[in-house]
Amino acid sequence: MISGVPDHVDGRMLAITEQAGGSIINRDRMWHYVEGIRNWAPLWTDHAIRILPGPSSLWLDARGKRLPVPLYPGFDTLGTLSHIMSTGFDYSWFILTKKIIQKEFALSGSEQNPDLTGKSWRQVLGRATSGVPGPVKAFMEKGEDFIVEPDLPALVARMNALVGGEPLLELAQVKHEIRARDRQLDNPFSKDMQITALRGARAYLGDRLIRTAKPHKMLDPANGPLIAVRLNILTRKTLGGLQTDLDSCVLGTDGQPVEGLYAVGEAAGFGGGGMHGYAALEGTFLGGCIFSGRSAGRAASRAVG
């Protein structure tokens, strides 16, 4: 795996709190992303950047087989992670075109989104018209996980070369998967659920403008060049945390509050450890983080009089 957090984010305070008597629950629950790429200009060890993908890229496993329904880009992180690991490999592939990458690829991290961090509406709106975003283009040119070629045979050859060892990808298999997908674009009542999903996404104006490319055939040279991206597993966070009561006071292994010790937000498993369900993440947890912080503040205020 590659690292989605800096070296100093090591969770050591959870262990220190446990040594002080605090109880940790759900320590087996982790959240790892499956769209990780190595940063060509790393800021920490094994620095990973996550691709925030639109719905159009074709997702293949290490042997070139398409991931099953509904494991499409941006759909189900935990389900996709489980499937990828069941293949016996720890990486997968996106196959896409220049038309897709210029509209559908966003990258995590403030340094990868200068338009947002710079608070420039002009630059944000430019995502709809300005071609491949600068940070994405830099990865296309310098990122070790990106391959750009004008035709499929050359693309597959370089994909195998990137991984090294015995070639795992067969040109015929990859071509079969792409052709099967492309054929469904001829049918307005597509039997391909991913095609149906991206057509549905484009029904929303915002996605049509800056997030979802117009459906097109990947093997049509007019839509090229072809692009392959090796996707690595990247670490992010534990979904477990310190067990607390309703005042956000840390509980000991005996179930009693540890006096003067509080835990909120991520340290408490996002407000209690699983209170939003197993597959919920990110913005879904904001309410629990804020609420647990408020509870801790009020309880601490009462404790000190």
Predicted feature locations:
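Glycine-rich loop(s) and the adjacent beta-strand/alpha-helix scaffold that form part
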Residues: 1-40, 282, 286-295, 299
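A glycine-rich dinucleotide-binding beta-alpha-beta segment and adjacent secondary-structure elements
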Residues: 166-271, 275, 279
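An anion/pyrophosphate-binding glycine-rich loop and adjacent beta-alpha core
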Residues: 14, 23-169, 173
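Short, solvent-exposed cationic patches
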Residues: 82-104, 268-280, 284-292
